[in-house]
Amino acid sequence: MELKEKRVFVAGLGVSGVALCRVLVNLGANVIAYDRKNEIALKEALEELKDLPVEIKLGEFKEEFLKGIELVVLSPGISLESEIVKKAKDMGLEILGEVELAYRLSKAPIYAITGTNGKTTTTSLLGEMFRNAGRKVYVAGNIGYPLIYAALEAGPNDHIVAEISSFQLETVKEFRPKISCIINITPDHLDRHKTFENYANIKGRIFENQREEEYVVLNYDDPVTWGLKERAKAKVFPFSRKKVLENGAYVKEGFLYLQNKKVIKVEDIYIPGEHNLENALAASSVAYLSGIEVDAIETTLRTFKGVEHRIEFVAEIEGIKFYNDSKGTNPDASIKAIQALKTPIVLIAGGYDKGSEFDEFVKTFDKKVRKLILIGQTAQKIKKTALKYSYPEEDIFLVDSLEEAVRKAYEVAEKGDSVLLSPACASWDMFKNFEERGKAFKKAVMDLRR
């Protein structure tokens, strides 16, 4: 793809936007970057770009910003309903997202992972399987390291394992991973995608360009994910926790199998919980189909310790264990976290409202969630739902900050309980992202020891 001397407009100056600017300048493009935020909010991004020949536009979008532009590249945070996209379409400009641009520039095969929950764990686990098999791998995408960087750095004999979000899939055109994988699909981001059907269809775009010689890995147990199989031109490789699938990945008599090959005893997989068994099956399937030996897969499953902010053990204080599941950004993710812990729980939940319903979330409390500490935009919404299902009002506490939530949780918890931060919501009402929220939780827990 020729970008030299091309006038390129980059919309959005988050992590992906800054990376796009760097790469496009490196490839000889004339870059104009735009974000509606002000200089104070974009301090870090502007600091990173200050030595690059990038023209910066901030504040309210003006049509004149697109004058002379030949290509518009969108950061994942920019909606296709935005004024920028509408104007660019009216002007007949080519519009790409980061994933599409990275694919067109990459010399290395891409193994793409999506799903509502488990993406980061599965992507990290798969990357580790490649490493343990002695392959040079770049783990990138929605996981933190921009895919556009990996695309430029990886050679034809290397491998890119990419976590891909629904926001990123909105803008794919020719994107064709060597192997794609959908772990699961449950309602999320309905504030952006409007309907669950639309959200599920966007997830399915991960494999829409794959050919007959390639593979798509799908969760047999999830009816929405499995229902997408009819759209696949690639070979479908299923995985299941519940059913023996001779031509897929499955569990039989307490062992994980890949087709007819016994891999590992399920109880020997280091990361706990049924949801992590699902992640293990998904990652193992992609690794197996890419030619990685079963020994390397088994070693990784036995030793991989999980990732930060996913049911991460933080500390034990006075017989009370604290777990950070800040990545629980939707109800289904938090349901899985509650199910994974075996002790009584004091739950800290609430945050930015993405339009989620909390009925199924509250139904899993049963007698396991002893106390409920609520924060953020959705605090009243979750409380109302909990009361609807007869959760005791005296066991619900609304507080103003995460630090206060941690102190209150410690106060009401008993020896043998687990305090679990699993918000079932995004972090954007109080924090920049779920990582910042998770770090704030861990600091607040450590402050209890002072």
Curated annotation (Swiss-Prot):
EC assignment = 6.3.2.9
User: What's the top EC group for this one?
Assistant: ligase
Q: Spell out where the chain crosses the membrane.
A: none
Q: Which family does it belong to?
A: Belongs to the MurCDEF family.
Q: Which gene encodes it?
A: murD
Quick one: a GO biological-process term for this protein?
Answer: cell wall organization
Mention one GO molecular function: UDP-N-acetylmuramoylalanine-D-glutamate ligase activity
The keyword Ligase is assigned to this record: yes
Pathway listed: Cell wall biogenesis; peptidoglycan biosynthesis
* UniProt protein name: UDP-N-acetylmuramoylalanine--D-glutamate ligase
Which domain of life does this protein belong to? Bacteria
Task: Give the HAMAP family listed for this entry.
Answer: MurD
Matching entries from Pfam families are given as:
Mur_ligase_C, Mur_ligase_M, MurD-like_N
Q: What does this protein do?
A: Cell wall formation. Catalyzes the addition of glutamate to the nucleotide precursor UDP-N-acetylmuramoyl-L-alanine (UMA).
Keywords of this entry = ATP-binding, Cell cycle, Cell division, Cell shape, Cell wall biogenesis/degradation, Cytoplasm, Ligase, Nucleotide-binding, Peptidoglycan synthesis
Positions of ATP binding: G115, T116, N117, G118, K119, T120, T121
Where, per UniProt, does this protein localize? Answer: Cytoplasm
A cellular component term from Gene Ontology for this protein is: cytoplasm
Which residues pair up as cystines? none
Q: Which reaction does it catalyse?
A: UDP-N-acetyl-alpha-D-muramoyl-L-alanine + D-glutamate + ATP = UDP-N-acetyl-alpha-D-muramoyl-L-alanyl-D-glutamate + ADP + phosphate + H(+)
